[in-house]
């Protein structure tokens, strides 16, 4: 367990070792969503395991909870879903995702990626709850060509938003290319 008040710099060598071994991936926070993305990286980051199965196994979560759902499992379901999407973005789409959060952390977009000369925000939802307040805040502030939400809901395209089902993430690049 981590000691209270621990900071990322306290674990810098361990984190680098896990990255070098390919066991974790870091998704870097952007100070500003602009091209090229790495130029606007700041010190914040999220860590994801190599595989969503590892996260499930490490959590000690009972398989029945995963299959049937459980109220006690609802918060962790979001973490598992975000892990799955991070894995899909890297492996299936070959993208290097970043993330964005507002200055006072009033809004956060789970992933931000570049395709061609466009930036796309991607919000992840574990259920069919389609409220994406942070995504709307981002859209209103930065006016991307399209905002993307991936959830358990069906494929749906609206004026400013594409809902791409979690099982359809392999189509992400093709969907973005149709806009260019």
What are these regions (language model features)?
Residues 1-115:
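Accessory nucleic acid-recognition modules appended to NTPase machines
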Residues 2, 124-126:
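Short, flexible loop segments at the rims of nucleotide/cofactor-binding pockets, characterized by
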Residues 62, 89, 174-180:
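Intrinsically disordered, low-complexity Ser/Thr/Pro/Gly-rich regulatory segments
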Residues 67, 120-121:
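Short small-residue beta-strand/loop micro-motif enriched in glycine and branched aliphatics
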Residues 98-99, 121-124:
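Short catalytic-loop micro-motif centered on adjacent basic/acidic residues
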Residues 118-120, 146:
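Structural motif
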Residues 126-166:
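Catalytic cores of nucleic-acid endonucleases
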Residues 162-176:
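Helix N-cap / beta->alpha transition motif
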């Amino acid at each position: 367990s981590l000691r209270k008040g621990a900071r990322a710099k306290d674990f810098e060598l361990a984190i680098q070792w896990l990255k070098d071994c390919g066991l974790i991936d870091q998704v870097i926070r952007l100070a500003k969503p602009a091209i090229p993305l790495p130029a606007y990286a700041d010190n914040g980051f999220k860590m994801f395991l190599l595989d969503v199965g590892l996260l499930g196994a490490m959590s000690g979560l009972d398989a029945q909870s995963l299959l049937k759902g459980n109220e006690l499992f609802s918060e962790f379901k979001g973490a598992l879903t975000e892990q799955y999407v991070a894995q899909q973005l890297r492996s299936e789409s070959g993208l290097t995702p970043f993330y964005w959060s507002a200055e006072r952390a009033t809004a956060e977009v789970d992933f931000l990626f570049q395709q061609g000369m466009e930036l796309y925000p991607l919000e992840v939802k574990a259920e069919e709850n389609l409220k994406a307040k942070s995504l709307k805040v981002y859209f209103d502030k930065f006016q991307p060509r399209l905002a993307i939400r991936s959830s358990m809901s069906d494929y749906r395209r609206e004026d400013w938003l594409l809902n791409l089902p979690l099982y359809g993430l392999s189509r992400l690049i093709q969907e973005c290319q149709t806009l260019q």
